[in-house]
Amino acid sequence: LMTKRSNAENVLGLHDELVIEPYANPFRVYPLVEDYRKFCRLFESGVSCYIINTGSYMGKTVSKEISLDVIEQVVDGTADFKPFGPIVGFDYLEYEGYPLPNFDKAYKKLIRERMQIRLNFLLAFNQKYPQTALPVGAISRLEKVLQDLES
């Protein structure tokens, strides 16, 4: 999970900083690789994954009503997803008032930077915790996303 620090957290001077939180479960007391394996089993069983921007998108606030509408479209099966530029396996949901930027050099650079942050986190994590390192597949998938953005 990549998120911004908020003033609700007990941290000094880091508000609005982009950070990686390796899990969304604050009660996890076991190695992260166990969550990774569980998620892989879910996806292998046919479960779909959706990432929803619930705070803001490209600097524009996303209201709770819009978030709920997006969730309802997914649940109802009416969401019409489109390919997300050159990134294989990534799709997006068009939403009025929230246009997808053109995949020009600047936008690709932004996405590459954000994906590189994630990749750097995984590489550092695996170096720091070699006994419970995440599988190479997690890293190679991010490397593939970065390659897709080079074209």
What positions do the PLM features span?
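Conserved NTP phosphate-binding and transfer environment spanning the P-loop NTPase/kinase superfamily
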Residues: 1-151
